[in-house]
Design a protein with these regions (language model features):
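Generic detector of well-ordered alpha-helical packing
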Residues: 4-7, 38, 106, 123, ...
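Acidic beta-strand-loop-alpha-helix segment within the catalytic core
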Residues: 21-109, 158-179
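Flexible, acidic active-site loops/lids enriched in D/E/S/T/G that coordinate Mg2+ and/or position polar
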Residues: 1-27
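Oxyanion/phosphate-interacting regions
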Residues: 90-94, 110-179
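Buried hydrophobic positions in well-ordered alpha/beta secondary-structure cores of metabolic enzymes
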Residues: 7-8, 76, 112
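Short glycine-aspartate micro-motif
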Residues: 1, 33, 120
Length: 179
């Protein structure tokens, strides 16, 4: 599966956060993932379901999500992309308070895999948006589901967290706006 330009709006305005996303799927499940950021001259890769790597400035580095961060100190990147009304957002004030970083499409998920961000949530992901990232996220140690705690393979509103404890707390906080 190929998403030739993930972050189309970023691409159009010249923001360097757009990417090329590629996944190899087997029986509908992503097994290999690549997130390439041409302008940033870096890419993220998982090809064995065991290890995820970032390649930058000619160097390969194994990446991991942050694991032992207390919930009170998590770094959250999120976006509603117009899919959750302002009225609905008012039902989740704790989530809004946690949001510290706007999402940058696939780059937010990639930074999550490096442990720079502890939680990423986005609405309206398509399968070509999330399939290439799922193997990278999982092999880096992350948890990835929909907001209603279903397998992310069918896309939709996606939540990724550094560990199951954080994930469960975020699912509970997002529940009022989960479909």
């Amino acid at each position: 599966m190929i998403d030739p330009i993930d972050g189309t709006r970023s691409f159009v305005i010249g923001n360097p956060t757009w990417s090329n996303l590629i996944s190899l799927n087997f029986k509908g499940n992503p097994v290999v993932g690549l997130a390439n950021f041409p302008i940033l001259n870096k890419y993220y890769l998982n090809f064995d379901n065991k290890n995820s790597f970032v390649f930058e400035q000619g160097k390969k580095r194994k990446i991991f999500v942050s694991k032992n961060v207390p919930f009170s100190k998590i770094k959250v990147s999120g976006a509603f992309h117009g899919a959750v009304s302002l009225k609905q957002q008012m039902k989740i004030p704790k989530v809004l308070k946690l949001m510290q970083f706007p999402t940058a499409d696939a780059l937010s998920y990639s930074h999550f895999c490096e442990g720079k961000i502890d939680v990423v949530f986005q609405t309206t992901n398509k399968i070509w948006d999330i399939h290439p990232l799922m193997p990278i996220i999982k092999a880096a140690g992350g948890v990835v589901t929909t907001w209603d705690n279903r397998d992310a393979v069918n896309a939709g509103n996606i939540l990724v967290s550094a560990n199951q404890l954080i994930h469960n707390k975020m699912l509970k906080l997002l529940k009022p706006v989960s479909k």
